[in-house]
Every structure is written in C-alpha cells, then in structure tokens.
Regions:
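Structural helix-boundary/capping segments
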Residues: 1-19, 31-36, 40, 96, ...
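Short helix-loop capping/hinge segments that flank enzyme active sites or metal/cofactor-binding pockets
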Residues: 3-10, 61-112, 116, 168-178
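Acyltransferase
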Residues: 24-47, 71-77, 101-122, 150
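Short connector loops at secondary-structure junctions
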Residues: 42-59, 90-91
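Short, surface-exposed loop/helix-turn segments at secondary-structure junctions
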Residues: 102-103, 133-153
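Short glycine-/small-residue-rich Rossmann-like dinucleotide-binding loops
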Residues: 130
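Small-aliphatic-rich amphipathic alpha-helix that forms the alpha element of a beta-alpha
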Residues: 146-169
Length: 213
C-alpha cells in the first residue's frame, strides 16, 4: 500500500480543533507525530466544519432514538429485564422529538458533505483520538452518554455520523505512563489511503510501547 501513496502526504490539521478544550498532552501527540514523519508529509491548516460540535453534543440523542427503534419489540414491555444504563439511553430516545432527530439527520448530511470537500485539499486529517491522553475507566463511566460527554466524543461522534473512515495509531507512552495515540481521518471509501498513511505514521513513531500496569 505504501508504494501507492504519493509523497509528501498532505495532512490537514485544524489547530483550533486539536487545542481548544484539549489537554496539552493530547495536543502534543499531534506535534510529535508531525515532527516524527518529517519531510514525508506536508501539513496544511484546515477548518473543520463547525457543525461537528453540535453533533458531538447530541450524538447521544441520535444513538438513543435508533437504539429505541432496535428494542421496540422488547422495551418498555420488558423493561424490568433492562439495566439502568440502557434504560437511561432508551428513555432519552423516548424523550427526543421527531423534529430534533430529523434536525440532527439534516446536520449529519451537511457535516458529511462539508468534511468530504476538505479531502479535495488534503489526503488525510490528523487529530487526537480523545481530548485527554487516556481516560480512566471511572472517567468513561461518569461521562457515559450524558450531557457532559461531548468533550469525550468530539473526535469520534462526528465521524460516526458522517461515515468517514478513521484509524487510531499508537504514539508511545506519556510521562504519566499512559498510552498515547493519534487519529487519522480519510475521505469516504478511501481506506486504502488511510491505511497507507497510518503505516507511514506508525513506522515514523517507532516500535509499539506498552504501559506498565
């Protein structure tokens, strides 16, 4: 695949997207990755479609409505068999209006088309995987799909909506001993380029490291 990848690879970075509300340790991964690949890439500043934030905030509502549809034969008829977390999600689906769901679907289409247009300028987009280096289990359980989960979803939910392929690449260990990673996003149905770009970054970042547990 690498032989088919034209170099230098054009990598898009929205510096506001990768810094605002993001832990410095997570942003540092982006700087380190760019330094590691060196002349193999050309970094181009881009602007993410601003609708990504609304999609991150309300991803839980879309997920909840679609989950409710999937469980229509069993919920609420067999609600006693459901755990509290799933009940919370299903009830969120019941409380989300059809108008709000339709609005999010329209926003999904807009974001998808605007993001796809960026790939006429760059080969891949580079971003953190999450706004912190690596969350603990407790942090993830506390965030769940609730209103305060948007920061955890800002680098994942928008692409879940749009259908763009993403790839997480290990990027070493941070000073606290936690694993680091970066994320690459490519045009729809361009997994070949995505995997080739991932191989380039993975090779440049060196051998896989494991945290001491």
């Amino acid at each position: 695949a690498m032989g088919n990848l034209q170099q230098p690879l054009t990598v898009g970075v929205d510096w506001s997207y990768v810094t605002e509300g993001v832990a410095p340790s997570a942003t540092q991964v982006i700087h380190d990755a760019i330094a590691a690949v060196g002349d193999h890439v050309e970094v181009k500043e881009i602007a993410m479609p601003p609708s990504y934030h609304r999609l991150a905030v309300d991803w839980g509502k879309t997920c909840a409505v679609e989950c409710l549809r999937a469980h229509a034969d069993f919920y609420p008829a067999q609600a006693s068999k459901y755990g509290p977390g799933l009940i919370w999600l299903l009830e969120l689906g019941r409380s989300t209006s059809a108008e709000e769901y339709a609005e999010l679907q329209a926003l999904r289409d807009l974001f998808r088309d605007q993001l796809e247009a960026l790939f006429t300028q760059v080969d891949v987009v580079l971003a953190p995987t999450m706004p912190i280096t690596a969350p603990t289990v407790d942090e993830m359980e506390r965030s769940s799909l609730r209103a305060d989960s948007a920061p955890f979803l800002s680098f994942t939910a928008p692409f879940d909506y749009s259908g763009h392929p993403t790839l997480n690449v290990p990027a070493g260990i941070d000073p606290e001993g936690m694993p680091r990673s970066l994320q690459l996003i490519a045009a729809r149905f361009d997994e070949t380029k995505l995997l080739a770009a991932g191989a380039l970054f993975e090779k440049a970042l060196g051998p896989l490291e494991y945290p001491q547990l």
